[in-house]
Amino acid sequence: GSARFRWLVMGDQLAEARATVTALLREVRRRGQVESEVHFLRGLAETELRSGHCGRALDLAREGLRLAHDSGIGETASAMLTSLAEASGGDVDRGLALAREAVEHAEQDGDTMYLSRALGALGYAQLVAGDPAGTVRSLRRVRELEQSLGITDPARGRWQGDLAEALVRVGEPAEAQDVIDVTREHALRLGRESVLAALDRAEALVRAAHGEHDAAVAQLTSAQDRFAKLGYGLEEARAAFALAALRDRRSPAVFDEATRLFRRCRALPWLRQVDEAVSVPEPPVEAPAEPAVLDGLAAMERQVAALVMEGATNREIAARLFISVKTVEATLTRVYRKLGIRSRVDIVRLAAGRRAK
């Protein structure tokens, strides 16, 4: 029964997985088998989380964690699952704390398998908390650990899309594309549809970072539709959120669908991200800068410089390009060096001078 449940979850058969694990949980409770009850509570919570039922998943995960603490059985695994549930539907700080606790225990035990899973939970919580650099650090370690363990099935941890997204946000789209390409090969071979949709969502962000707006919108729209058909409610909402961020923010309704979907999931930490995005105003659209000003800059540097010329703040640039404010600052430093200037004011003056000529 347990093996069949895992096979169903990895194969995106969420309704069947829920029915299977619910029956298993009912049976072990009837028999008073506490160790199995802790295990199957985690399984049911995981299924609900993947289905986008974040409130239900959080209740089950917390129940399982209490039982694990009381019995001394499966505490690390329960902490990892509860971390994912907290970061999705509860308190993201609690999610971070639980994941770090699980990482510490796995390191103390020398358990490489559990360490990779705990770091995966930590990386996800860091992404939700707005720390993409932390996500990159955690999930690069997961990649190294899984390679050392010979794990090639991306449905085991499902961290690859999050790593790619975080890499885009810290200004590393080339590495993000490499993660996507390598993972897609395995996902296609194994038929992991939800993983492929997550990779498409991340690849759309790579395209957006390269200025391929229309292609990014088309890929995100497709990814959202695939998640909806598979029944992955939270992932569908995340795709809608990414899509909204690419659209014209002067329309007050641009984030409405993402808000509706996250509310349906009871994904409170994600709703807070939407609220923050809504509060970032769209910079005014002005005439495009003279291309010659930006010759010699890399793609990301050109985009950042062009937005500076439009009058965008670093925070606004970060929101529009799906990168962190620190990445914007580092990119601007490179722009200053290449253009032989000292400040963002000089970029605007340089552009104005070229236009005057």
Segments from the language model and where they lie:
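Helix-turn-helix DNA-binding segment
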Residues: 279, 285-357
